[in-house]
Amino acid sequence: MPDGVKHCGACLRHPPPLTRCLAAVDYGWPWRDLLARFKFDSHPGWAPHLAWLMQGSAWAEDTLHEADRVVPIPLSRERLAERGYNQSWLLARHLAPGKADASLLLRIRHTPAQRTLPRAERLANLEGAFAIEPLRAPQVRGQRLVLVDDVMTSGASLHTAARVLLQAGAAQVSAIVLARTGLGEDDQVQGEAT
């Protein structure tokens, strides 16, 4: 965005539920290929190094310091069994070891991979996919939460999860991702697969 512009036109028309969203790198070469390998080719050992990159994002240190909890975008049981690990949990655990909380937000419905869908269908795909762990719901009220994901393309996963957390009483929800597509690229990129 041009200097001095804080919000794009889309955000002005439909304000996102995130207080802020920080990204370490652009989701182009070589990051797209590296992230695909991290996520799909069983390279969980890369998580500490990728989290270190995320910590270097502008405002990341302040955002993590201010957070009460750092919450990874959860995978469905089916996707977790298929992949063997949740890449967002690995990143969150290394970003904020004392604040990472993988049991607060649940994926209660398996959905087709976001990367297989056009932008317009991504939000509908995730409707009802996330919920707060019922016994933990009181712990959300008044909390400043940070969602963690590896890639943000359309923002559907992060926005849907943020809305669930805000409806449960979170004071604010921000997000930190490793990579973000450029504005207007959401329909061409096929990378958000949580």
Question: Where are these predicted regions, by residue range?
Answer:
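Glycine-rich phosphate/pyrophosphate-handling loop used in enzymes and phosphotransfer proteins
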Residues: 1-194
